[in-house]
Amino acid sequence: VDFTKVNSESLEEFLRNGKEEAVHLFVEEYTKTLGKSNMDSFMFCQYMLINIQVGVMKFVEKMGVEKANIDRTFKDYKQQIAAVSTGEKAAEYIEELIIQAIRMRNERLGKKHSSLITEAKEFIVKNYQEETLSLSDVADQVGLSSSHFSTTFKQETGKSFVEFLTSVRMD
């Protein structure tokens, strides 16, 4: 059994950027890199699942998800890990864990973006009379890059920054 094959970096990268619909393919590739003999080992699967579980919980905690919410979401993980007896069951459990983490990430990012856009709109309303007010000024205020802010602002409000600023100035 080769424990060095567990790659926590690729898991963390997927947790940060992966999409829910790509989880199955990611887990398939991830478990393939671990090797069939490792996936057929009960001891290896238990080790891997605990390692992944801890990685997922650390990830959502770093995202700012409340500890009570993490504990509630993953409360039965010890029993679930103990019940895994095959490589296929391990892969299914990994998929469940990652999907839950991605949903928590997306919910958290949605709330974060929503509050940033609210802050940006308040800043615009307070400073709209300044002729030099620009998208980059507002993006700096909320701590986002100009391009990311522009995209997020349009998605959240349905208006571009310029359209919103113009409507505020006209009111």
Which stretches of residues belong to each language-model region?
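Cytosolic nucleotide-utilizing catalytic cores of signal-transduction proteins
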Residues: 1-171
